[in-house]
């Protein structure tokens, strides 16, 4: 199942390679998610579209009991697709970056890897970044 085109993947890699700061990756900005973690008490979490892993690291620090794994095809250290399922699949500020042709596949991938819960947060405003072809990153 394809989750992205090779051309778009190269553009995302370029964005990640040319920026030092992550995007929407401050856990304090998503208090509602923290409340869900407290309520659900998951043991495992997949951060789908984790970028360079800043949010992933914050989750690991705040919830040391939680086995956290990141996946992002545009960042080499997180580019291996997970095989296992997770109590929670966390997808923060990612789906607006998915090419429309691949959106159904990405949602199926997320559903397949979730045992119990899925958290989706979609940024609907224009991004501060542009892709190399001039399109807004959102």
Feature annotation, model-predicted:
Residues 1-86, 101-107, 135-138:
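Conserved N-terminal segment of class I S-adenosyl-L-methionine
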Residues 82, 86-91, 98-138:
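S-adenosyl-L-methionine-dependent methyltransferase catalytic module, highlighting the catalytic core
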Residues 72, 93-96:
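Conserved acidic functional residues
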Residues 44, 90-93:
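Hydrophobic transmembrane-helix microenvironments that flank and shape a buried ionizable site
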